[in-house]
Amino acid sequence: IAKIETHNIHGKNCQCAIHRKGATRAFSGDSGQIESSFQLTGQPVLVPGDMGTGSWIMAGPKTGQNQAFGSSCHGAGRALSRTQAKKTIDGKALKKRLENSGIRIHASTPNVLSEEAPDAYKDVDEVIELTNKAGLARPVVRMKPNIVVKG
């Protein structure tokens, strides 16, 4: 779904229809396009990682607009397709490994768990570092998984 937003293109403000495929909004606090409660912090950006390493909360740039129409990543991204993950990752061994690291797991089948295995995703911490370096969004806090439910 596209959203009508104001963006500066070649020095002129224009109303643009923005469709973010594989991305989410990441506006600065001074953009004039976010809730007043986020004017001091910038727009919250939730970046899920995987069930083993964790996720991040980021915020839009401190000031101004990033070079991606106020957009940022919205996840670590897959390194393996679901099919590849099911073929190469042992769901029972994965469950044991995650539980041994203190993460409680509830999954309907081991195959379902394999699809979402940490090895099936890119390194979320590296994605966050690159997102920050690119000026798309700023890291605020890293969250650690405690419980995973996969249906």
Where are these regions (language model features)?
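Domain-length cofactor-binding catalytic modules of enzymes
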Residues: 1-151
